[in-house]
Amino acid sequence: MKRPAARWGVGAVTIAFGVLTLVAGGRVLFGDGAAEAGDYVPFVVWFNFIAGFAYVAAGVGLGLGERWGAALALGLAIATLVVFAAFGVHVLSGGPYEARTVAAMTFRAALWCALAAWGYRLIRRDRYA
């Protein structure tokens, strides 16, 4: 890849996002964060916590410019959109939720769609360079 600084910058930010996701989700699931979280939706928190490990791996892959990093980012984008849709069904059926969950899932979906597109663009560009 021709832009290692950009790759590593994106990789580092992605890894940091994964670590923060693990810490935040872990606090809600295993610590004292449940009281602060309010009406959190358990399947969303579990998904985000488990996905946090994949976020770290995707950050490494994207930082290295590996095809599997872009593929993992795409998989995370799709999985996040599926969970977001399930969350929407939960909300529309009258389930309790926090408004910040809507914002967080919107951010996560947009982030992973952008990272997947960025990763594939760089891989494709390097293949034909």
Question: What are the functions of these language-model segments?
Answer:
Residues M1-A129:
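Topology signature of small-to-medium multi-pass alpha-helical membrane proteins
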